[in-house]
Structure formats: C-alpha cells, structure tokens
C-alpha cells in the first residue's frame, strides 16, 4: 500500500527540511504526494520532489503527485514544467 503525504501549503526554503524528512521517511515503498493544498512551490522543494521522483523510479517504486492545486500548476509553469513532469515512471 502506498504511503500518502500531504504537502504543506508553502513549499519554500523554510519547508525544505520538513519535506526532505517526509520523503526520507517514506523511502521504503510507494509514495503519493497530496498536492491539493499547495499555495506556493519554491525551487528547492521542487528539486526535492523531482529528485524523489527519480529515486523512486530507480527503485522501481510507484511515485505520484496527486491533484496539484492551481497555484502549484502555475508555479510549475514558471519553471517551464507541467504536472506530468512530476509523474513517476515505476509501477
């Protein structure tokens, strides 16, 4: 069963340590990030999410970002990304 982690509303540099800890604590299985409440996505947290996606894929574990908020989608667009860029490759 996949672990589900609800992302903080503000994913700025102040939230990076907490996000890193949440990701590290979930590294042993499939992971879904609940992005419904994200109001701001900063570069450092985006890097952590993209890195986690790659790590989960390398481990052949499922990784998903579920229901990104409109604000998160807007922030992704500013980085030249779409929500699909956060999708994991493993099943």
Positions of PLM-derived features:
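STAS-like cytosolic regulatory interaction modules
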Residues: 1-44, 48-91
């Amino acid at each position: 069963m996949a672990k589900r982690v609800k992302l903080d509303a503000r994913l700025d540099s102040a939230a990076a340590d907490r996000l890193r800890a949440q990701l590290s604590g979930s590294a042993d299985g499939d992971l879904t990030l609940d992005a419904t409440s994200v109001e701001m996505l900063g570069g450092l947290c985006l890097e952590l999410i993209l890195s986690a996606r790659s790590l989960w894929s390398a481990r052949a574990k499922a990784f998903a970002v579920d229901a990104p908020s409109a604000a998160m989608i807007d922030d992704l667009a500013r980085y030249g990304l779409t929500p699909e860029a956060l999708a994991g490759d493993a099943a």
